[in-house]
Amino acid sequence: MSPNAMPQDSQANVDIMSVITRGTSWQWMLLLGLALLGVAQAAATLAYQTYVGLGIAGYQAPVFWAVYIVTFVFWIGIGHAGTLISAILFLFRAKWRNAINRSAEAMTVFAVLTAALFPLIHIGRLWKFYFLIPYPNQRGLWVNFKSPLLWDVFAVNTYMTISIVFFFVGLIPDFAIARDRTTGIRKFIYTILALGWQGKSGQWKAHNRTVLHLSGLATPLVLSVHSVVSWDFAMSIVPGWHATIFAPYFVAGAVFGGFAMVMVVMIPVRRIYGLEEYITDYHLENMSRFILFTSNICGYAYAMEYFIAWYSGVEFEQTSFWLRAFGPYWISTWCMIVFNVIFPQLLWFKKLRTNIPFLFVLCFFINIGMWFERYVIIITSLSREFIPAAWGLYIPSLAELSVLTGSFCWFSMFFLLFLKGGPIIAMVEVKELIIHEKAHGGAH
């Protein structure tokens, strides 16, 4: 974008704050209503499940990790793109991240909050959740550190804590701008959230130092958290799971699906609120390149899984992967391959990388494909283990599908509320970019 096309830095405050200050549209109210309805029906399902038991969730031998665990892994993965954009690209000084990092950070926090529900849902007895916390107690019981469920508790809570702190610290200067441009109860709330920010040089030094340290802390978390989640499976001897490739495979898939979800969220927001001057085609094209890159990594991992199963000569592994492609779950497997590997290859063409409707549709299907990837990994391996007499056919129950739908509504509810409560674009960072671009006459 040329400097002449850039808005004035003062205009950036007006444009971005207008998303918050303008009245709520009927479209926003409709979407929020649908999201609340979805959350309500999922809550009703969970209440009934808690009363009756996990039997209504379709759990039956040999599949006792099902849609709830699939969806947990999916949402944890979605949360990784925000940290990648905000932390890793910040450390690499990639300026194009400035316009999209806030949306990505918000998505990260809300995705992790969604994922955190599923270990609790999976244990069935919600009121016993504190048994997962290692603390001295009169019962003489201690947590089982060999349990993948406990690994997930530590991974999710660590990642959620860092993500929320990182998200909030970045919002402080923008809360101060919102404080000075609103009145009434909104001004009161923003005043509290701004923590006395006045934009003094000392505050900026402390803020920049904090963001830098949090970025350095969050970067290894991107790699470690989903690696820990992948070890839920890789540490077992179940055919199709016991593989050393799982950690990098899961991390690449998480970034891939996370970037696709950022696009699905950002493209409508950009269009509806007229933010094309800030979230430009240049940003979307750069994200498309990341999606293409991580898609190819996932494709390589898929191919290597099948190759190693063949090369190993282990009959159980070969049978497991044969059944994935041609067994009762073949539709899920081929949806995964087509949506995650074949369709993204169209991004080699620049015309398609800059075609906004195409990007939205593609990223929507990528997220479907990434959910199917987790479904294929978990369900197919558990339903066809070592003993043929113990094989079974798993079919998701209505209760699981209800909670799955509710998780997307839960995520959407948070994001819609944030649209009207917090700046969806980091105003301070965008203004820095505008000033820098006008001074140097270069694209960002």
Can you say where each PLM-predicted feature lies in the sequence?
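Interfacial and helix-entry/exit segments of alpha-helical transmembrane bundles
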Residues: S103-F110, E276-G299, F358-G369, K431-A439
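Hydrophobic alpha-helical transmembrane segments
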Residues: V73-I78, K146-I164, A254, W330-V341, ...
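Transmembrane alpha-helix boundary signature
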Residues: L46-Q49, P119-F131, I172
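Membrane helical hairpin/interfacial module
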Residues: V63-W127
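Transmembrane alpha-helical segments in integral membrane proteins
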Residues: A81-R93, Y159-A176, M261-R271, V341-P357, ...
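N-terminal signal-anchor module of multipass membrane proteins
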Residues: M1-I78, S412-L416, A443-H444
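Long, contiguous internal "core" modules enriched in hydrophobic/ aromatic residues
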Residues: V19-T21, W26-Y48, N137-M336, F349, ...
